[in-house]
């Protein structure tokens, strides 16, 4: 917590007027949303105590403070994945810092593989629930009763409704499904994909779940969106690679960023922390 306090002090010193209400966490293909920011300031993670050094292509490693529409936001452009260090709490300090700065909502994004043949590359999926296949938690070592976090409504129903309404208004098709977290960095085998489908998963990726757990532990309400970059292993003739993920993510980046910015700017945030479309 001392590191969180140091990061918070740094931000309050260099951005004393910042009062973000919504935290955004951007995965591969979603970086274009920063072009929708106004009155923005940028802080490299390297300049913020306890913030991780993102080592994966497509993750800038920068915090932006600004506005999207009338909503003050804090944008985490890039995350640290569990496979980079072996630890799954790499985003703990950034998320706790932004919560302390005033963020009551986390809108996070990722690039994912599809287990649904009808949901091909370039599709967007609203995360309704997740499966923690890694069976690890970023809360290990936490104390107090707050560590026993209920996850029955991990992805906020009213925020999902707002997202669907915005997508309908923009004419953007938005799938909804279950995201399954694998540690990586290797891609899944065809046999694993068949097993995951039997478990009820619709998309698979290497992030998002730890950050959702951290946000719910802090009391933040969560919305998550997946940009589908490929059909999962064994579902097509493609050889999966990170380069393919980045290339496919770039193709749909404009659509994804436009939808995300519209969702955030449409939120009506009341003083009591409620949100409505």
Describe every region a protein language model picked out:
Residues 99-102, 197, 216:
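Non-catalytic positions within long, well-ordered alpha-helices that form the structural scaffold/packing
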Residues 104-105, 202, 221:
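Short acidic/polar active-site loop segments enriched in Thr and Asp
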Residues 233-277:
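His/Asp/Glu-rich mid-to-C-terminal helical/loop segments that flank catalytic regions of hydrolases
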Residues 165-202, 267-268:
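Active-site/ligand-binding-proximal alpha/beta "capping" segment
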Residues 206-244:
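Zn-dependent metallopeptidase/amidohydrolase metal-coordination segment
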Residues 10, 14-17, 158, 162-172, ...:
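Generic non-transmembrane alpha-helical segments
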Residues 1-151:
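Metabolite-binding pocket within alpha/beta catalytic cores that recognizes anionic/polar moieties
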């Amino acid at each position: 917590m001392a590191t969180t306090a140091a990061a918070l002090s740094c931000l309050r010193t260099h951005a004393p007027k910042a009062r973000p209400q919504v935290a955004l966490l951007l995965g591969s293909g979603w970086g274009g949303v920063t072009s929708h920011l106004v009155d923005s300031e940028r802080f490299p993670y390297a300049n913020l105590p306890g913030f991780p050094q993102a080592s994966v292509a497509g993750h800038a490693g920068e915090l932006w403070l600004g506005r999207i529409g009338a909503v003050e936001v804090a944008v985490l452009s890039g995350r640290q994945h569990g496979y980079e260090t072996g630890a799954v709490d790499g985003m703990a300090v950034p998320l706790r810092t932004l919560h302390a700065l005033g963020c009551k909502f986390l809108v996070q994004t990722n690039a994912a593989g599809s287990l649904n043949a009808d949901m091909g590359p370039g599709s967007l999926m609203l995360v309704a629930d997740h499966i923690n296949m890694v069976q690890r938690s970023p809360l290990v070592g936490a104390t107090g009763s707050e560590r026993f976090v209920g996850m029955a409504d991990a992805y906020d129903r009213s925020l999902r409704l707002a997202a669907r309404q915005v997508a309908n208004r923009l004419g953007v098709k938005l799938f909804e499904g279950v995201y399954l977290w694998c540690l990586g960095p290797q891609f899944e085998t065809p046999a694993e994909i068949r097993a995951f489908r039997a478990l009820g998963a619709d998309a698979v990726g290497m992030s998002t779940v730890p950050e959702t757990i951290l946000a719910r532990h802090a009391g933040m309400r969560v919305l998550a969106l997946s940009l589908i970059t490929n059909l999962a292993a064994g579902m097509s003739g493609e050889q999966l690679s990170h380069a393919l993920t980045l290339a496919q993510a770039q193709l749909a980046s404009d659509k994804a960023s436009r939808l995300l910015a519209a969702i955030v700017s449409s939120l009506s945030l009341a003083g009591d922390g409620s949100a409505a479309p």
